[in-house]
Design a protein with these regions (language model features):
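A short, active-site helix/loop in glycosyltransferases that binds the activated sugar's phosphate group
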Residues: 116, 155-180
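Acidic donor-binding loop of glycosyltransferase active sites
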Residues: 268, 284-302, 317
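Conserved donor-binding/catalytic core segment of Leloir-type glycosyltransferases
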Residues: 206-225, 230-234, 242-245
Length: 390
């Protein structure tokens, strides 16, 4: 089997399908980007990273730098270079004996990749849904939803990382409801601790000068976070160190940015900036408490499944989260807060317990049973089940 994944622009998609090579003969991870975005990143169509390369055994990568408008404005033309590249790769990794069985699989992560499916006509297609994409492109929401409904009809299996999106797509395309599955993110192998950690592990970089406890957040610093809550939390624990990992936001006139800037300016807040994916698991393990302070009611937070749930679960350390839908699914392992007072109380309670909430073993068990490799295998189980009911 050769499985092409279009695309892995988000780390969660890459982490999942990078561990799927146990189920397939080869995996091709595709990064596809607009020329303007690529230019800002220093990438050109002739850059070395745009060449097809086998980065590790049976895991191939290729980056496409495409003209502006390739996805939404003229997708039939824009997808052609990607389709040609996938066909060449299938021929390259497929058996030399043309009579041998070889399945050509395609994973698509946006509805617009339906045009890629139509050009390739693979043996099977998986629609891997990460978000409510109409929120990305609200001015063409009707077009996005129409294309998504057709994608669900055509795909052999649709996998949604959030339950809300699962329910929405089942209702929108009832004739394909049996092919739509809720499958939350898995824990990437590098994020899984070797053992349960009732107490924080050593830091991956010299931070011993910062006083404990360490309250950590890893992720984008944006409007989706409850910044007033974070400011209240910093006020409540002036002796704690708030360790923030993520690129600082660009200045903005939006009210959230003022609250964010006020938080980052505090003496007990330490914004470390961006860190490589390979290091993040160790940061989760070194925090006294991992924070998921998403703003309740924010449309993106309602529709998404934050990867940091299972990333932090793999570290086994205590997690305090606001009550967004996907966090509500783990009330026995996350300290889920319905409001600011409950969030503050949960943090205080854990710190009063010496940063050990007694749940490290249970979190370790859940993460171990839901690694990215195991979650990827479930997709192929869904695919087999779908074939059996045809």
């Amino acid at each position: 089997m050769g499985l092409a994944v279009a695309d892995v622009g988000w780390f969660n998609t890459e982490n999942l399908f990078r561990e799927a090579n146990g189920e397939t003969s080869a995996v091709l991870l595709l990064s596809c980007m607009d020329l303007r975005i690529a230019w800002k990143k220093g990438l050109r169509p002739w850059s070395s990273v745009c060449a097809l390369r086998e980065r590790e055994s049976r895991i191939w990568e290729k980056t496409y730098v495409l003209p502006t408008g390739w996805m939404k404005t003229y997708p039939r033309i824009g997808m052609r270079p990607i389709a040609r590249g996938i066909r060449r790769w299938w021929r390259q990794v497929g058996p030399k004996d043309s009579s041998a069985r070889f399945e050509r699989g395609l994973v698509i992560s946006y509805p617009y990749y339906l045009h890629l499916h139509n050009q390739l006509r693979p043996d099977f297609t998986v629609y891997y849904n990460l978000d409510d994409y109409a929120l990305y492109w609200p001015t063409i929401a009707d077009e996005v939803y129409a294309l998504e409904r057709e994608t669900v009809r055509v795909a052999d299996v649709t996998v949604c990382v959030s339950k809300l999106r699962t329910d929405q797509l089942k209702a929108a395309v009832p004739e394909a409801a049996h092919k739509v599955h809720h499958l939350p993110h898995g824990t990437p192998s590098p994020f899984l601790s070797d053992r349960p950690l009732p107490l924080p592990a050593d830091s991956p970089e010299p931070l011993s000068h910062l006083p404990r406890p360490w309250l950590g957040f890893i992720g984008s610093l944006e409007d989706r976070l409850d910044w007033p809550l974070m400011n209240r939390l910093a006020d409540a624990h002036p002796g704690a160190s708030f360790i923030i990992i993520g690129r600082p936001p660009a200045p903005s006139d939006e009210p959230w940015y003022g609250e964010c800037a006020r938080f980052l300016d505090r003496p007990n807040v330490h914004a470390l900036g961006w860190r490589p994916q390979a290091m993040l698991g160790r940061y989760y393990q070194t925090f006294d408490i991992n924070l998921i302070p998403y703003l309740i009611g924010h449309p993106f937070n309602e529709a998404c499944n934050p990867t940091k749930i299972m990333d932090a679960m793999g570290a086994t350390r205590p997690i305090v989260a606001t009550a967004i839908p996907e966090c509500r699914l783990h009330p026995e392992l996350l300290h889920v807060a319905e409001d600011a007072e409950s969030f503050l109380a949960a943090v205080k309670r854990i710190l009063d317990q010496g940063s050990n909430d007694g749940l490290a073993i249970q979190r370790f068990e859940l993460a171990s049973q839901n690694t990215c490799r195991i979650v990827a295998a479930r997709i192929f189980e869904y695919l087999e089940a779908s074939r059996n009911v045809r």
